UniProtKB/Swiss-Prot annotation:
Biased composition (Polar residues): 304-319, 396-408
Designated name of the protein: Mblk-1-related factor 1
Lineage, opening ranks: Eukaryota, Metazoa, Ecdysozoa, Nematoda, Chromadorea
Domain HTH psq-type: 145-197, 334-386
Organism from which the protein derives: Caenorhabditis elegans
GO molecular function, a single term: DNA binding
Pfam families linked: HTH_psq
GO cellular component: nucleus
Gene: mbr-1
The protein's role, per its UniProt record: May act as transcription activator. Plays a role in neurogenesis by regulating neurite pruning between left and right AIM neurons and left and right RIF neurons during larval development. Regulates olfactory plasticity.
Length: 433
């Protein structure tokens, strides 16, 4: 009994042999690896034949080791010490993490990670993160350029082509942004910038405006000359009436015309040739209409005079007949519209009366009398508003009439009072001496 060792005594005299220790460590490591593999392996996979063999070997080893542990209590103590040595870092990390969380629950600084890194549990993880953080940083400009390149889906050539198309009037900003894939704001900013930098667009615009004005003046002069020629051909208007439109349309003296011809290097013959150019039929048609309006009826025309004016211009009667024929064809080809106002005015009045009396609703009266509901509702509202206005006017007139009658009665009463005062004789005492 005394020879048995006590479990509480020191283990100095009861160390296991080196072979037993190595065997125990090997089995322990194999058990830990198998548990880790089981935890890491997905649940859906089934164990293979090799796994069954490994399980069998581990079972045999455990069956061989467990009796030794039960027979030798010092082996159990060594096993517990080994487990504590393996779990000590994890326990320290858990205690430190709990203390940090309880002290500073919202501390997101690097202090906590530095404290945790003092323990050698996460050294590998921190080393890998440090290696990634030490990677050479790229300059900021390159990152910005990359972001700009990713944003831009167009080239500089597309931008210039789009701006040219917008300037020439081929495309608008909206259509150009869709065709070239450029934002509309970018196109606008580019156009504004180019207009602010160079004065070429303003000069071009001024030249276009001047050219348009010159064309308009030339058209007016041609109209005036055609009108004067037609009036001379008819002979119904006086010279003053024929010269006045010419002067009003082309206010230019002969001296000014000669100077202008000399400045441009043209001769009067060339200008006469230009003025005798074939006229536009639209202008002639407008002139004919104005002449017929002034004269009232159709005037007989000399064929010789009109042929002298212009042999290629068609007669107004033929033009009008062609126009009327074209209008008739257009009217025939046009699809027939829907018939509006199929209801009668009396039906509308009856429907309005029935709605205002409360006999029917708007919907029922409209369907009964064949009147659109919107029209009926509008008419009922209009009648109600008119009645309100009439009531207001009547009340105002009645109030004014009552006020006037009160004033008249008050003045009459005042006059009667004054007359009564004046008519009553004042008694004076008469003394007879």
């Amino acid at each position: 009994m005394n020879s048995e060792p006590k479990p509480g005594l020191a283990m100095s005299s009861h160390f296991m042999g080196t072979d037993n220790q190595d065997q125990y460590k090997g089995t322990y490591a194999m058990n830990r690896l198998s548990i880790a593999n089981l935890l890491n392996s997905p649940s859906s996979t089934l164990p293979t034949g090799n796994d069954f063999q490994n399980f069998g070997l581990e079972r045999q080893i455990n069956e061989g080791v467990l009796p030794q542990l039960l027979q030798n209590p010092w082996a159990i103590n060594f096993w517990l010490q080994f487990q504590n040595a393996q779990l000590q870092p994890h326990l320290q990390y858990a205690a430190l993490a709990c203390s940090l969380v309880t002290e500073n629950p919202l501390d997101l600084s690097n202090k906590t990670m530095n404290m945790l890194q003092k323990i050698g549990v996460f050294n590998s993880v921190t080393k890998s993160e440090d290696d990634e953080s030490v990677a050479p940083e790229k300059p900021v400009d390159e990152s910005l350029n990359k972001s700009n390149i990713l944003r831009r889906n167009y080239t500089v050539e597309d931008l210039t082509q789009a701006v040219e198309d917008i300037r020439q009037g081929k495309l608008g900003t909206r259509r150009a942004s869709v065709v070239y894939g450029i934002p509309r704001s970018t196109l606008r900013n580019k156009i504004y910038k180019l207009e602010a930098e160079g004065a070429i667009p303003s000069k071009v615009r001024r030249g276009k405006i001047a050219a348009r004005r010159a064309e308009a003046e030339q058209k007016r002069c041609v109209e005036a000359t055609a009108a004067a020629a037609l009036l001379d051909a008819f002979g119904n208007q006086s010279d003053s009436s024929s010269s006045s439109p010419h002067a009003s349309m082309c206010p230019s003296s002969p001296d000014s015309t000669n100077s202008s011809l000399e400045g441009t290097g043209e001769t009067p013959e060339m200008s006469d040739k230009k003025s005798c150019s074939p006229l536009d039929p639209k202008w002639l048609e407008s002139i004919w209409q104005n002449l017929f309006k002034t004269q009232g009826n159709v005037v007989p025309v000399d064929s010789a005079n009109i042929s002298n004016v212009d042999t290629h211009t068609p007669t107004p009667i033929s033009e009008k007949s062609q126009k009327m024929h074209g209008n008739e064809e257009w009217k025939r080809s046009r699809p027939k519209r829907g018939q509006y106002r199929k209801y009668d005015k009396n039906a509308l009045d009856e429907a309005v009366r029935s709605v205002r009396r409360g006999e029917m609703t708007v919907h029922r009266a409209g369907s009964f009398f064949g009147v659109p509901h919107s029209t009926l509702e509008y008419k009922v509202k209009e009648r109600n508003l008119m009645r309100k206005k009439k009531d207001c006017l009547y009340s105002h007139d009645s109030s004014t009439s009552e006020d006037g009658s009160q004033l008249v009665t008050s003045t009459i009463s005042e006059k009667s009072d004054s007359s009564s005062h004046t008519s009553t004789p004042i008694p004076f005492p008469i003394s007879l001496v």
